């Protein structure tokens, strides 16, 4: 119910806003970078919103590693990991060098370490995922068919609009998790922090390592600055490895334009 209500409120705010029409600045950024994708940018109160490619913004897609945001809270709630626990690397060399070592929750989140979160998923189990995803209203809440990969290549889907609605509930601490879990997640989500602003975010890349699958890049999070909180969700088609950096670049360019990031 919460998920549907949050999406309804966000959609209503967008429809009532003059920003619902294709935003010229956002469209220009995507066009200049030759990117097919979408971006939703919304203030906490939902009154001020900017969008690019409204149809794609409402299209549910695999969340990939952006699911590490709720997954971290679910793992802490299930007590399968603690803040200072370390999981031992199994010695298998994987494609990302930062994954080839022992991992803590913070290092695994920041490096987007797949094997670490898959190990947590084995401990969490399908039944707990099913109940937790329904309880927090994340996307379509379908954790199948495999409990260790449903966010990478399974049935779970979420749209950019739903990502923003979920992040707002996360920020307001409306989800059923302990304060200590919220505080830990807030800390490990920090990408950049200055006296003027704090940026918390997570990347994702659905289809990574599988060229037969659709390649979908994500960047979701929120920016706290000058008494305001801006929430964003970008997804885009990834056509080449160099596109990975465009996820962050596009969002940062938009934040500089719309959120007065450096004022």
What are these regions (language model features)?
Residues 1-4:
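Positively charged n-region of N-terminal signal peptides that target proteins for export
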Residues 86-101, 105-110, 124-125:
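Acidic helix-start/capping segments at beta-turn-to-alpha-helix junctions
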């Amino acid at each position: 119910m919460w998920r549907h209500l949050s999406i309804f409120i966000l959609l209503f705010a967008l429809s009532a806003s003059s920003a619902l029409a294709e935003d010229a600045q956002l469209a220009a950024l995507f066009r200049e970078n030759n990117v097919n994708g979408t971006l939703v940018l919304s203030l906490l109160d939902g009154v001020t919103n900017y969008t690019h490619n409204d149809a794609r913004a409402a299209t549910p897609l695999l969340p990939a590693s952006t699911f590490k945001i709720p997954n971290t809270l679910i793992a802490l709630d299930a007590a399968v990991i603690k803040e200072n626990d370390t999981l031992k690397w199994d010695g298998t060399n994987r494609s990302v060098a930062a994954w080839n070592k022992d991992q803590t929750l913070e290092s695994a989140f920041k490096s987007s370490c797949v094997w670490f979160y898959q190990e947590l998923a084995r401990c969490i189990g399908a039944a707990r995922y099913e109940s937790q995803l329904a309880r927090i209203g994340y996307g379509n809440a379908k954790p199948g068919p495999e409990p260790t990969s449903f966010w990478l290549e399974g049935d779970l889907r979420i749209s950019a609009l739903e990502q923003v609605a979920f992040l707002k509930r996360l920020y307001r601490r409306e989800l059923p998790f302990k304060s200590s879990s919220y505080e830990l997640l807030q800390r490990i989500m920090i990408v950049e922090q200055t006296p003027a602003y704090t940026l918390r975010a997570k990347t994702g890349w659905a289809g990574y390592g599988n060229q037969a699958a659709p390649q979908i890049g994500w960047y979701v999070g929120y920016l706290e600055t000058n008494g305001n909180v801006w929430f964003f969700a970008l997804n885009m088609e990834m056509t080449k490895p160099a596109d990975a950096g465009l996820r962050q670049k596009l969002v940062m360019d938009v934040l500089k334009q719309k959120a007065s990031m450096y004022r």
